[in-house]
Amino acid sequence: IIMEEGKVAGVRALDDRNGHVTEYRAPVVIVASGGFGANHEMLAQYRPELLNAVTTNQPGAQGEGILIAQAVGADVVDIEQIQVHPTVEQSTSILLSEGIRGDGAVLVNSEGNRFTDELLTRDVVSAAEWEQPGGWAYAVFDRKVYDENKSIKEKFEKKGLALSADTLEGLAAQME
């Protein structure tokens, strides 16, 4: 990062293939380097309520670009805006497609109660889910939703992470 008179004026980039350094200058520099969802220290600083959340982030999401920019005095904007997903399988971190909510799945808590409008934004649905007993929910849907979302079979059913029944009563009995 090139600093001039207390401001970011550009960056120097190294081409690993040939060792050539190129300088890029601009009147405004925006660093878009990825997130920090796997960096517990940064989560504790900016979003401590997410420290115990199950994450779908890959382990490399450490926020190094943000830390480098901050180290030279760059400002950060909206750093607390971390994308969260309400339909993450809790023991494996596998993400259940948001398409299932759009197709008609409902979320119920461990007591079998629906607690939100599933079509609200991710952050709103996630916040409602965290308020439930245990901070998680079941996604309940019919055969039509199942048939339209092939990832359910591949990611969940084959791994023994999905429950299935012919009636709601039968499904509820399995959830106990």
Tell me the role of every PLM-derived stretch.
Residues H20, Y24-E89, I94:
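Glycine-rich loop(s) and the adjacent beta-strand/alpha-helix scaffold that form part
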Residues V8, I30-S33, I100-G102:
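Short glycine/serine/threonine-biased micro-segments
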Residues I2-E23, V29:
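Conserved beta-strand-loop-beta-strand element in the redox core of flavoprotein oxidoreductases
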Residues Q62, I66-I68, V72-M175:
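An anion/pyrophosphate-binding glycine-rich loop and adjacent beta-alpha core
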Residues V11, G35-A38, D103-A105, N113:
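Gly/Ser/Thr-rich helix-start
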